[in-house]
């Protein structure tokens, strides 16, 4: 049992740390580490759920990310040559991507993971309670340019500054850009702060293992 082994190892660690005054810092670090992890378990959980959803979830998320340079490039005034090259690269990538894309499978993944992610986030972000996943899924896979090869390639091929208005009505684009920024600006940021606090405590704890148990395999 992993929990029992952890408890046994930590009890042995504390007992050894109490044997010398100069080692007390190691048991203090262990206590602080465990307490901090307990108090901030939500940060690790929300981060893990967000990574699974936004980086390993439905394929249309990847299409939106891949398109961002093209859409942002137009708005930032890149040269016509650069813009055209970016457009052609995106069309080429889309055609390669389409060969292995299965809309039905992707929609099933979206439905399952969105329900799961909604359940994990709803207490932190009440806006999730407003989302009907089945209805949203129908809109995204029935209307979005990012879930249909023909719609996507036609859109990119004829993309101009006026095309950006269509994006504001695209259900996949609107959904992704409503919730992914929250993950980046809130969840990811909080997790990195959590890690920054954990790191020195973990380093002190590991230092204690090497100092107090030099003959053990670490």
What label would you give each PLM region?
Residues 1-218:
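Terminal presequence/propeptide segments associated with secretion/organelle targeting
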């Amino acid at each position: 049992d992993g929990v029992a082994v952890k408890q046994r190892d930590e009890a042995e660690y504390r007992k050894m740390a109490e044997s010398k005054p100069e080692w007390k810092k190691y048991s203090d670090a262990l206590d602080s580490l465990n307490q901090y992890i307990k108090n901030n378990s939500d940060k690790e959980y929300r981060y893990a759920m967000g990574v699974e959803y936004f980086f390993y979830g439905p394929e249309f998320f990847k299409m939106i990310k891949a398109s961002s340079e093209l859409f942002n490039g137009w708005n930032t005034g890149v040269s016509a040559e650069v813009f055209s090259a970016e457009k052609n690269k995106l069309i080429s990538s889309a055609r390669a991507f389409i060969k292995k894309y299965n809309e039905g499978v992707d929609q099933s993944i979206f439905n399952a993971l969105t329900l799961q992610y909604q359940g994990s986030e709803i207490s932190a972000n009440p806006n999730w309670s407003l989302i009907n996943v089945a209805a949203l899924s129908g809109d995204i896979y029935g209307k979005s340019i990012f879930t249909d090869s023909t719609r996507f390639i036609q859109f990119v091929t004829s993309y101009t500054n006026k095309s950006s208005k269509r994006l504001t009505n695209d259900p996949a684009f609107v959904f992704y850009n409503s919730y992914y920024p929250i993950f980046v600006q809130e969840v990811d940021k909080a997790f990195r702060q959590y890690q920054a606090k954990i790191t020195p405590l973990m380093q002190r704890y590991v230092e204690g293992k090497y100092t107090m148990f030099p003959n053990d395999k670490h």
